[in-house]
């Protein structure tokens, strides 16, 4: 794209002339230009407004929780006299009240709101500041709560993003948080992760010595015996792997480079064979392998091709990171702990590139993760091309300012007025086939998710655009074929993300079934063409509800109790309650009530999948909650992602799903949702509705097959101990999955920051059961801070081992693979004028800079520097190419 630039002098002259000619009759373009140059500054005033005199309940706040924020708009050179304009902005919190009478804030849809002038608007003079005091629902404790890319409109002028918010860095338009505002509630007992608190936490790490690092493999094998002596690999390795495909061998050769090895006919001999009958019955599992390394050669025996591939990955994992690569002589017998070892990636909320998807899949294979759950659609975007339904990508994959939504979806999640960022985008048919083949070569199953019946707004809007186009062309029958709404449905609903009834496709329409059948058929054809038959279909199914009928609200016409928002519940409906098509289903006895519609629809989808030969239907568990058990569905297997928050009862309710015959994939948000922040600090990005923080150590300490145990090793959202017990039988876990939802993830670098290195402890828990993980016992109670069923010393020792492997070996390998993982922020304190600093991982470099300068020096723990005043610290990766965020330390 060609761009023309003006000199600073020309810009100044232009601005002066422009300011001179602006009059009361400003053109729409002039108004938009003036608004686009406004400076926006958001200041969090009080996150506990309900405890400080604001009647949050009367304002209708869920659970009577609200916060106060000031928005300050500072005008530029040009006065704004017109009242024909709007400022659109993204707010993940419902706006309850705005106290400047010159302005009105209106909720548009989802997180999109607009500011417009009222009849009391007096204009905004050049350089004038105006303040909009806002009361919003819940709280806002992280910078990432505030979305970028406000934009301005006026008349028929093209909308423009406000320059001050057109950034990926919210600190550019959000004022620094005061210490009092990092807590959600007064009873929040989480520890704010300052440099000093982080230093104290990091002191617990006891890194392994170089000798102790011999033969360490991630994920940890079932059984490993080290022998005396190491093998020199400086000449490379000579691979002879029988039974692997050409594509699999290509992957292995690429992974050689990540551990600084090369294929060489004169190198160390590595032989591989597939011999299923060599394995005992208990070890006859896909992915099982045996590895023997002697001074003469290495021999890998796989139970199957997957096992041979994994055996080779274990060999590469064992290679040292020393300048002269070596490997310990050893014997390994290994098999996977769980059948399902997964990673979920949401590309619906924000689009992520094919390249970052492939990098993720490649690293999954290195750590023996085998299920890629691909969340391809959501309210905010449809991300896969479906031949025959071009509107899904022409409209549903794009976000821009079109109030009629005939050409795109309305902006959401900081995407702004235009479609030139990750709010827009999709995978072509060929892209998806490429991803399938890429995953196949790495023994990873791609599980597509087309979310329904809720979270379907991108599909609903797209099919309405299709309906309007075909109807205008006179094709009434074609227009109705895939329509997803019942025009008779006047239900008043609010989805979890603040959309209206168009967030849900109507499960009672034949046209909705036509749509599902069409999409399934087209995706199946892509799988067939890729040589990867579709085995698992993810139905989605989550959150088909009206949040304003939830327990945090009460009806203004009933008895009023404290702690709940007061609203008019009588005007609220359950989804589809006023749809004549759904009313008829209930009247005819096909469905018992509106609550059962989602599960009823899931049953119908499962029947279609079974007829197409798909053996497994997967869903978020709440989408199937009204079924009796797994036998209600037609597919051979029915699998659920179990995502109840553990401390709110998930330690017990998981058993119900397993006992009903579902394959349970543990996906608890308070442990393995990787869109949650790494630590309790406003600068860490992420949502925090389930937990204030989940760092690598918390993921590592998670016991997925004995959920009550986690009460002894973690705290709840408010940093408090909790108690967990279940009296029910527990048939056992089917799998473990880590999730990255993308509401606050807008770039590929942010994807990798949030996923890595948390994926590594996820892989460890999915593959290997640690000694400190207790077997489940019905009736055993775990009380945080009191009971001692878990060996905390064994857990600490295991973490020391794992953290050393990650810091010394795995992070440099991620660097070589081009993965933009999160570099840990140093812990630091100044004691008696001396800077003390440390890290959560060994192997990285700490740097410091004195005062306000950016003169960075390497920190030495052996010779800590004497300092005066404030000091900035940061960590740098081993390659010296990237750094952590900067933390400031001052003398206490």
Give a label for each model feature.
Residues 76-109, 148-150:
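Short acidic, flexible loop segments centered on an aromatic residue
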Residues 40-80:
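Short beta-strand elements of extracellular/lumenal beta-sandwich folds
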Residues 100-140:
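Intrinsically disordered, low-complexity Pro/Gly/Ser/Thr-rich segments with frequent PxxP/GP/PP motifs
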Residues 615-830:
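Flexible, acidic glycine-rich loops studded with aromatic residues
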Residues 784-892:
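Short, compositionally stereotyped local motifs that mark structural "simplifiers"
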Residues 146-306, 310-336, 617-626, 822-825:
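Acidic, contiguous N-terminal accessory segments
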Residues 493-497, 502-637:
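Active-site neighborhood of glycoside hydrolase catalytic domains
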Residues 286-288, 292-504, 509-515, 520-536:
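Feature activates predominantly on carbohydrate-active enzymes
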